[in-house]
């Protein structure tokens, strides 16, 4: 599975990463660019793509936003893949949920060497759910939005769909780094750390 973001302006360009791209997009004058959040994967060359469907979201998780969203969705549907067309706020919330997923599951997994995403979901669920709640609260406060209830259930369901994935804290700038930047900003302003558990575990692993 992956996050894939398509940026359409006067022409189609492509960029992809498992992480927070909003600051980078804004720095390039692309804050309003059309985007696609893709949840599908190809196991190997020639294999059909595997759609990102879970037991809590059987309709699929892939989503598109912007002027060309309907056209992108139609092309994905033609290829047998799901795709929802969302407004900007709904898309942003789904993007942030995926960021929370990868930041939380990778960090908890790294605390337990050898743990896959599936092992984290089964054996360390209380740890990862505590972190999900903390990161969701920080993200909601920063962006001024409200997430739908039961995020932990949705993210655990996604983890069951990609249970074989290994865990590691990497691409820090794009993933956990965004949440750590909220910590740094709060502390610089003399405010409490909005992500104390996240910060403690990053320090435990000597990431920061």
Predicted segments, located by residue:
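NAD(P)-dependent Rossmann-like dehydrogenase/reductase catalytic/cofactor-binding core
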Residues: 70, 74-77, 81, 126-208
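Short, surface-exposed loop and linker segments with low hydrophobicity and enrichment for Pro/Ser/Thr
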Residues: 5, 90-101, 189-196
């Amino acid at each position: 599975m992956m996050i894939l973001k398509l940026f359409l302006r006067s022409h189609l360009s492509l960029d992809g990463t498992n992480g927070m791209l909003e600051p980078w997009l804004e720095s390039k004058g692309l804050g309003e660019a059309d985007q696609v959040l893709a949840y599908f994967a190809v196991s190997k060359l020639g294999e059909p793509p595997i759609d990102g469907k879970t037991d809590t979201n059987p309709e699929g998780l892939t989503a598109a936003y912007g002027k060309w969203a309907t056209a992108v969705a139609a092309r994905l549907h033609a290829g047998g893949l799901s795709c929802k067309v969302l407004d900007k706020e709904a898309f942003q919330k789904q993007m942030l949920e995926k960021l929370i997923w990868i930041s939380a599951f990778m960090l908890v997994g790294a605390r337990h060497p050898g743990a896959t995403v599936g092992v984290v979901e089964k054996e360390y669920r209380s740890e990862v759910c505590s972190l999900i709640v903390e990161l969701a609260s920080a993200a909601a406060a920063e962006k001024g939005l409200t997430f739908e209830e039961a995020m932990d259930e949705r993210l655990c369901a996604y983890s069951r769909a990609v249970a074989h994935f290994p865990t590691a804290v990497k691409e820090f700038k794009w993933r956990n780094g965004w949440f750590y930047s909220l910590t740094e900003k709060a502390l610089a302003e003399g405010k409490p750390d909005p992500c104390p558990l996240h910060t403690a575990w990053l320090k435990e692993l000597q990431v920061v």
